[in-house]
């Protein structure tokens, strides 16, 4: 599987947030960006990961980082997810999976013993110059947010 590499310029994107406002990577680069791709709102692993990132929100802020989650869900789904789980991370809509493809976070993966196409749970730390500092592919949701925080 092809992957992005540390030291590369992070691919720019323009996606809508849960309020329908378009946001690009460049809009976020006043801080380090923790960009995480996840498969679907309101599913067990994705909920755990989002809640963990939200619980550590102030710790990420202390390290001058903003946390942004991206999935193929629409704005309405994100709004519901944010409300139900009391999330404080930014969620962006990648319904056509263009951003996931740019970040090599969409492709073949195993689910319940079968291979299928889908979002590959991945996280990227991007510095204020837009350069990839860390790339995590095929991550497990449990404990991942803490691991990312420790990597900053």
Swiss-Prot record:
PANTHER family: AHPC_TSA FAMILY PROTEIN (PTHR42801:SF4), THIOREDOXIN-DEPENDENT PEROXIDE REDUCTASE (PTHR42801). The active site is a conserved redox-active cysteine residue, the peroxidatic cysteine (C(P)), which makes the nucleophilic attack on the peroxide substrate. The peroxide oxidizes the C(P)-SH to cysteine sulfenic acid (C(P)-SOH), which then reacts with another cysteine residue, the resolving cysteine (C(R)), to form a disulfide bridge. The disulfide is subsequently reduced by an appropriate electron donor to complete the catalytic cycle. In this atypical 2-Cys peroxiredoxin, C(R) is present in the same subunit to form an intramolecular disulfide. This is Putative peroxiredoxin bcp. GO terms for molecular function: thioredoxin peroxidase activity. Thiol-specific peroxidase that catalyzes the reduction of hydrogen peroxide and organic hydroperoxides to water and alcohols, respectively. Plays a role in cell protection against oxidative stress by detoxifying peroxides and as sensor of hydrogen peroxide-mediated signaling events. GO terms for biological process: cell redox homeostasis; cellular response to oxidative stress. The gene is bcp. Gene3D superfamilies: Glutaredoxin. Pfam families: AhpC-TSA. One of its GO terms (cellular component) is cytoplasm. Belongs to the peroxiredoxin family. BCP/PrxQ subfamily. Monomer. It is an enzyme of class 1 (oxidoreductase). Residues 4-152 form the Thioredoxin domain. It comes from the Bacteria. Its EC number is 1.11.1.24. The active site is at residue 46. The lineage of its organism: Bacteria, Pseudomonadati, Campylobacterota, Epsilonproteobacteria, Campylobacterales.
